[in-house]
Curated annotation (Swiss-Prot):
Transmembrane segments: 3-23, 361-381, 431-451, 504-524
Gene that encodes the chain: yidC
Keyword flag DNA-binding: no
Subunit structure: Interacts with the Sec translocase complex via SecD. Specifically interacts with transmembrane segments of nascent integral membrane proteins during membrane integration.
Name of protein: Membrane protein insertase YidC
Localisation per UniProt entry: Cell inner membrane
Species whose genome carries this gene: Francisella tularensis subsp. novicida (strain U112)
Length: 551
């Protein structure tokens, strides 16, 4: 390691390899789910013993169970629906056919920079359906309930939609409570048994989504392919687990059921956004499954026995919106873990906390990245200064090193010995400059995940042509400037003794310009800023060292 650019090569190579491995690991092994499987009978439903606590923690049931019935999205095409708008939601459609929420758009999040239409997180659009539904189940069979609209009333800034319906001797009153400023919806069911016998009832809150896992492919040079799409869930025993749609599609339609053990939630995760059902009962069970290739379902169901002429209240919270920690932390234990920064989340959360506070002052995420970089360089300045002084000393030793190379050009063993003697005599450690660079690896990786996973940086502009710091530079200006800064660093650093190595080093700026061209522009901005500060520090320290150590 005789030059700063070699250390940069080490840093970025390790970081890129680590990021790639983590991304591939997340997709290949999203969760270490050790399942206890039971031998299900041919028509065994996963609704069996729904109110019992004696089931195994995880059960895989038969694909021919009642749960595995396909979701018929087309039935909503001509059904009547109620539309609600809030401060954060646009056109929330609740179908009167069964009370499913078949559409919900997010006012503060547009589809793209070019299309300012609010993105539809839940949608009944053909081919990409994604709905949230609450199904009433009697004797392990879903019943069909056609609801009637009882109107919307406003209380304390909240809109409350009430639907009523009846089927199989049950009278059902369902209410949806919308807070004007929040993405969570309270869904409450009052179920009255009008028959003369007890009835075993299940309320199944679930999501159904049409999604092609084959299109969710991994690419080394596509930063956004490292993100996760699939199911996430939490129980009292298991704080956070994930299963990708790709892995679930390999289960041959077999549903998987998990005891919540008193608390839990289940969610569909995608880049930046999450939809989660949070049951409020203590005996809920969580499940997920693949229905017919491209349709996936996940939910939480709660069972109860209702005596004749008695009622039962069962409620849940539905969250469908951006993955923002402040929105999630109070809704349910561990729901904030859907903001997954990976194995270095501790550092990522600190970096985001600092960036967020700086952003609140300057109002620009690009400036926040630059100022965070300056802060990081300030914190690590003592180590960096030591590294640059070491390189300055190595640079002053270059004439003596070249003389040794000429003298012992035919005896590499003797050359190595003389070089070590020279380093010892001058108290120089050629590896001393590596430590500051190695310490930056977790910072580099942590910032990468902050830029990739934080919805706050989605479509966040910087200046001029940079309109989205979470995406690559559309004109590759920042990667080119970053490459030029690397080239300038080479000129300030001691040249490699090996001519072949020197030629290879000449191409490093080009190689890394190509690699960084596909990275989020915010990350390239960080690295460019880091390089420019490093160049300034190195130039000042080198000149000062040379001025004070002239012989």
């Amino acid at each position: 390691m005789k030059a700063n650019h070699i250390r940069i090569l080490l840093l970025v190579t390790i970081a890129i390899m680590f990021i790639s491995l983590m991304g591939k690991w997340e997709q290949t092994f999203p969760a270490d789910n050790t399942k206890q499987q039971t031998s299900a009978t041919q028509n065994n439903s996963h609704y069996d013993n729904a109110d019992s606590s004696t089931n195994t923690d995880v059960t895989t049931t038969d694909a021919k169970s009642s749960l595995a019935k396909e979701t018929n999205f087309s039935k909503y095409d001509n059904a009547k629906s109620i539309t609600i708008n809030t401060g954060v939601f646009k056109d929330v459609k609740v179908s009167l056919l069964d009370g499913a929420i078949i559409s919900a758009s997010l006012k503060d999040y547009s589809i793209s920079l070019d299309d300012k239409t609010p993105m539809s997180l839940l949608t009944d659009k053909s081919g990409s359906e994604y709905i949230a539904k609450s199904t009433i189940v009697v004797n392990k069979q879903p019943i069909s309930v056609n609801f009637e609209d009882q109107g919307i009333k406003t209380e304390n800034g909240k809109q409350i939609l009430t639907l009523t319906g009846s089927a199989d001797g049950l009278q059902i009153t369902r209410t949806y409570t919308f807070d004007d400023t929040k993405y969570n919806i309270s869904v409450s069911q009052n179920i009255k048994n009008t028959t003369s016998a007890p009835v075993n009832v299940i309320v199944d809150d679930s999501f159904a989504r049409d999604f092609d896992p084959a299109g969710d492919s991994f690419s080394l040079l596509n930063a956004h392919s490292y993100t996760f799409t699939g199911v996430a869930y939490s129980t009292a025993k298991d704080s956070f687990r994930k299963e990708s749609f790709k892995d679930i599609s390999k289960t041959n339609g077999q549903p998987t059921v998990i005891n919540s053990d008193g608390q839990g939630w289940v969610a569909f995760l995608q880049h930046y956004f999450v939809s989660a059902w949070i049951p409020q009962s203590t005996n809920a069970k969580i499940y997920y499954k693949n229905l017919n290739g491209d349709v996936f379902e996940a939910g939480a169901f709660t069972g109860a026995t209702i005596a004749p002429n008695q009622s039962e209240n069962i409620s849940s919270i539905l969250y469908t919106g951006p993955i923002i920690k402040a929105n999630l932390v109070d809704l349910a234990p561990n729901l904030e873990k859907t903001l997954d920064y990976g194995m270095l989340s501790f550092f990522s959360e600190i970096i985001f906390w600092v960036m967020n506070h700086i952003h609140s002052l300057v109002g620009n995420w690009g400036l926040a990245i630059i100022l965070v970089t300056c802060l990081i360089k300030l914190i690590f300045y003592p180590l960096s200064a030591k590294s640059y002084r070491s390189m300055a000393k190595m640079r002053m030793l270059q004439p003596r090193i070249k003389r040794l190379q000429e003298t012992y050009k035919d005896d590499r063993q003797a050359l190595g010995k003389k070089m070590m003697e020279l380093y010892k005599e001058e108290k120089v450690n050629p590896l001393s400059g590596c430590l500051p660079m190695l310490i930056q690896i977790p910072i580099f990786i942590s910032l990468y995940w902050v830029l990739l996973e934080s919805v706050e940086l989605r479509q966040a502009p910087f200046i001029f042509w940079i309109h989205d710091l979470s995406m690559k530079d559309p004109y590759f200006v920042l990667p080119v400037l970053m490459g030029l800064s690397m080239f300038l660093q080479q000129k300030l650093s001691p040249a490699p003794a090996d001519p072949m190595q020197a030629k290879v080093m000449m191409f490093l700026p080009v190689i890394f310009t190509f690699l960084f061209a596909s990275f989020p522009s915010g990350l390239v901005l960080y690295w460019l800023t880091n390089n420019l500060i490093s160049i300034s520090q190195q130039w000042i320290i080198t000149r000062h060292y040379q001025a004070t150590h002239k012989k």
